[in-house]
Swiss-Prot record:
It comes from Cereibacter sphaeroides (strain ATCC 17023 / DSM 158 / JCM 6121 / CCUG 31486 / LMG 2827 / NBRC 12203 / NCIMB 8253 / ATH 2.4.1.) (Rhodobacter sphaeroides). Keywords: Chaperone, Cytoplasm, Nickel, Nickel insertion. Gene3D superfamilies: Urease metallochaperone UreE, N-terminal domain, UreE, C-terminal domain. Signal peptide: none annotated. GO terms for cellular component: cytoplasm. GO terms for biological process: protein folding; protein-containing complex assembly; urea metabolic process. Residues 173-182 have a biased composition (Acidic residues). Its main location: cytoplasm. This is Urease accessory protein UreE. It is found in: Cytoplasm. CDD domains: UreE. Residues 146-162 have a biased composition (Basic and acidic residues). Residues 128-182 are annotated as: Disordered. One of its GO terms (molecular function) is unfolded protein binding.
């Protein structure tokens, strides 16, 4: 059995130059990994063994132990292009922590019949497509937006602290308080 070349280092786009020895096309979910066997488009296998789980951006490259580079490209997948008043749509999509590719005249999300129905109800136009999906990275430099499902199948409790704030104000001069504090 032949041992696979290992990739223990990831170079971001702009950190490497020259032609890559190969290319691997991965869907959005597949571009979130730590350790996995992959194959280039030419069929050459290699083992990714990164120090931690990493979100791979299109254009980055795995550096193999022998110095060769394998470029990462986004694979085509089923998405829906959203057009119309996209500013409002962007708010609703973001409020649901849904990965979203933001372009000047459209938003692109993965297929989700519930979200699609809501967006149609807001007057947006939806066009199912098959194309590479390159959503924005997560907030605070994490590189990935992870959904926050409130369903019971998540295997964890849901005891987030909830804060309720009650604001009171001093009565205006023309208001009379309900009770005399004295």
């Amino acid at each position: 059995m032949t041992e696979l070349p290992q990739a223990r280092r990831l170079l971001k786009q702009g950190e490497w130059t020259g032609p890559a020895a190969g290319c691997v096309r991965l869907g959005y979910d597949e571009r979130f990994l730590r350790r996995k066997r992959l194959e280039t488009e030419a069929g050459d296998g290699f083992l990714v063994d990164l120090a931690e789980t990493t979100s791979l951006d299109e254009g980055c490259a795995f550096e193999l132990a022998d110095g060769r580079l394998v470029e990462v490209r986004a694979a085509e997948e089923e998405v829906v292009a959203v057009t119309g008043p996209i500013l409002r749509a962007a708010w609703h999509i973001g409020n649901r922590h849904t990965p979203c590719q933001i372009e000047a005249d459209r938003l692109v999300i993965r297929r989700d019949h519930v979200l699609e129905e809501m967006l149609r109800g807001l007057g947006l136009t939806l066009e199912p497509r098959t194309e590479p999906f390159r959503p924005e990275g997560g907030a605070y430099g994490h590189g990935r937006t992870l959904g926050h499902d409130h369903g019971p199948a998540q295997g964890h409790g849901h005891d987030h602290p909830h804060v309720h704030v009650h604001i009171s104000h001093k009565p205006d001069e023309d208001e009379t308080p309900d009770a005399d504090p004295a």
